């Protein structure tokens, strides 16, 4: 089976072709980072318009690179949600229109299921069951995964997600958009400076996350300290360590609660070097393994949507002709794949 995947949930237009026997045949990505940089964040209307401008040329490019004709496709998968409604509707309109014109089945994919399954694009893919840590700009959640569609959300962010906290803290430090990667780069130059940053919600039972208080603590620290490059690097390091430690503590709890010894990390923040190293050390210490996608598949991309959609289309799942976007969509409401 061969599927065209379309991702337009936020500020990246991602298109890919995936074949269940040959693997990933092509993927094309256009990032809107430069477009939104002047505004310090994503402007939804501008994001939607840029998707309109780029999506059809990228589809042509992906099909050409995959040496795939329309007749070779067995289905179309597009991101249905969660995300920015205008951006979602661009991908949904194009995906549904092509499915109708080409007489192909189509399915709307959950964006976070795409991230969750992204490590399965790798040669050394995880087997079920496992615990998944999904960390991105809009989501932080721990999920018990027993199969595709067999999800139990164990904990999630009650305010700012981890990626959002990175971006907002970067802005407080005067770093350009996108802030998260720039803050991590600055933190790599930092030294231990004795800052006692909190590890939010680790002093009580439970697996939920909260990073808004940590962001405020960081803002107060920035205001109280000298404004020089090394001090900012030290504060960035202390902030990053606090976020990573918090995520690691919650992961350990989730693994203990489920009894599983496999951990998947995915989403944009999963590209963070300190997070990967910390979780790898933790899993080694408890005799488990950690899995994550390659860097280019940590951020939003069409490959993960093509793969996730293929699993459901192959199981006979598809949707009607209605164009639908779902900006809010609980992950654990998805049907299982038989």
Curated annotation (Swiss-Prot):
EC number(s) on file: 2.3.1.234
Positions contributing to Fe cation binding: 111, 115, 300
The record's free-text note on cofactor binding: Binds 1 Fe(2+) ion per subunit.
Compartment list: Cytoplasm
Coarse class of the protein's main subcellular location: cytoplasm
A Pfam family assignment: TsaD
Cellular component annotations (GO), alphabetically ordered: cytoplasm
Gene Ontology MF terms in the entry: iron ion binding; N(6)-L-threonylcarbamoyladenine synthase activity
Leading EC class: transferase
Keyword Disulfide bond on entry: no
Keyword match tRNA-binding: no
Cofactor: Fe(2+)
Superkingdom to which the source organism belongs: Bacteria
Entry binding sites for substrate: 134-138, 167, 180, 272
Swiss-Prot/TrEMBL keywords: Acyltransferase, Cytoplasm, Iron, Metal-binding, Transferase, tRNA processing
Reactions that this protein is recorded to catalyse: L-threonylcarbamoyladenylate + adenosine(37) in tRNA = N(6)-L-threonylcarbamoyladenosine(37) in tRNA + AMP + H(+)
Gene Ontology biological-process entries: tRNA threonylcarbamoyladenosine modification
Main function: Required for the formation of a threonylcarbamoyl group on adenosine at position 37 (t(6)A37) in tRNAs that read codons beginning with adenine. Is involved in the transfer of the threonylcarbamoyl moiety of threonylcarbamoyl-AMP (TC-AMP) to the N6 group of A37, together with TsaE and TsaB. TsaD likely plays a direct catalytic role in this reaction.
PANTHER family xrefs: TRNA N6-ADENOSINE THREONYLCARBAMOYLTRANSFERASE (PTHR11735), TRNA N6-ADENOSINE THREONYLCARBAMOYLTRANSFERASE, MITOCHONDRIAL (PTHR11735:SF6)
Family of the protein in this entry: Belongs to the KAE1 / TsaD family.
Protein known as: tRNA N6-adenosine threonylcarbamoyltransferase
Name of the gene this protein is made from: tsaD
């Amino acid at each position: 089976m061969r599927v065209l995947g379309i991702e337009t949930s936020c500020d990246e237009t991602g298109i890919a072709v995936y074949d269940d026997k040959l693997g990933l045949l092509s993927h094309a990505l256009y990032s809107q980072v430069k477009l939104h940089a002047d505004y310090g964040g994503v402007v939804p209307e501008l994001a939607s318009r840029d998707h309109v401008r780029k999506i059809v040329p990228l589809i042509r490019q992906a099909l050409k690179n995959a040496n795939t004709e329309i007749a070779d496709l067995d289905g179309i998968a597009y991101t249905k949600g969660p995300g920015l409604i205008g951006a979602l509707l661009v991908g949904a309109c194009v995906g549904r229109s092509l499915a109708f014109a080409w007489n192909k089945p189509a399915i709307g994919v959950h964006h976070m299921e795409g991230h969750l399954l992204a490590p399965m694009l790798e040669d050394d893919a995880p087997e079920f069951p496992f615990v998944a840590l999904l960390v991105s700009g809009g989501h932080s959640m721990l999920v018990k995964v027993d199969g595709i569609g067999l999800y139990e959300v164990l904990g999630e962010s009650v305010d700012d997600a981890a990626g959002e906290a990175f971006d907002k803290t970067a802005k407080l430090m005067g770093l350009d958009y996108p802030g998260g990667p720039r803050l991590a780069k600055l933190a790599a130059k930092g030294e231990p400076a004795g800052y006692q940053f909190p590890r939010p919600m680790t002093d009580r039972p439970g697996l939920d996350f909260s990073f808004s208080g940590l962001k405020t603590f960081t803002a107060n620290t920035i205001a109280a300290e000298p404004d020089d490059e090394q001090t900012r690097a030290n504060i960035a390091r202390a902030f990053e360590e606090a976020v990573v430690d918090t995520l690691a503590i919650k992961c350990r709890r989730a693994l203990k609660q489920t009894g599983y010894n496999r951990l998947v990390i995915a989403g944009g923040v999963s590209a963070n070097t300190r997070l990967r190293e910390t979780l790898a050390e933790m899993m080694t210490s408890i005799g488990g393994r950690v899995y994550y996608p390659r860097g280019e598949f940590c951020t939003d991309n069409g490959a993960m949507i093509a793969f996730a959609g293929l699993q459901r289309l192959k199981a006979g799942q598809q949707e009607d002709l209605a164009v639908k976007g779902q900006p809010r969509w609980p992950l654990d409401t998805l049907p299982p794949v038989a």
